[in-house]
């Protein structure tokens, strides 16, 4: 599992191979707050698949960055 740091958050990329041979985008945003760790799962669209793990991870990373940006700017219902 590849880990990426983005604006103080850790993003764990964990795209999964489908039985059909394609790849589905998956990631986890890890938030360290006070003495707690929160893990927020990020999933690509259910029907979207990619030809390679690299493509799926790239899409999962972009979705994760959007989630983090929304959290920072209050777009996720959190401040």
Pin down the residues of each PLM region.
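N-terminal segment of the canonical double-stranded RNA-binding domain
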Residues: 1-34
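Compositionally biased, intrinsically disordered low-complexity regions
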Residues: 17, 30, 34-35, 69, ...
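Double-stranded RNA-binding/processing signature
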Residues: 38
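Acidic, low-complexity intrinsically disordered segments
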Residues: 41-79
């Amino acid at each position: 599992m590849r880990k990426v740091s983005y604006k103080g958050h850790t993003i764990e990329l964990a795209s999964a191979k489908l039985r059909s041979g394609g790849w589905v985008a998956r990631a986890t945003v890890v938030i360290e707050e006070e003495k707690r760790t929160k893990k927020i799962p990020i999933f690509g669209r259910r029907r979207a698949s990619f030809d390679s793990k690299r493509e799926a991870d790239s899409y999962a990373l972009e979705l994760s960055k959007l989630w983090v940006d929304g959290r920072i700017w209050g777009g996720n219902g959190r401040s």
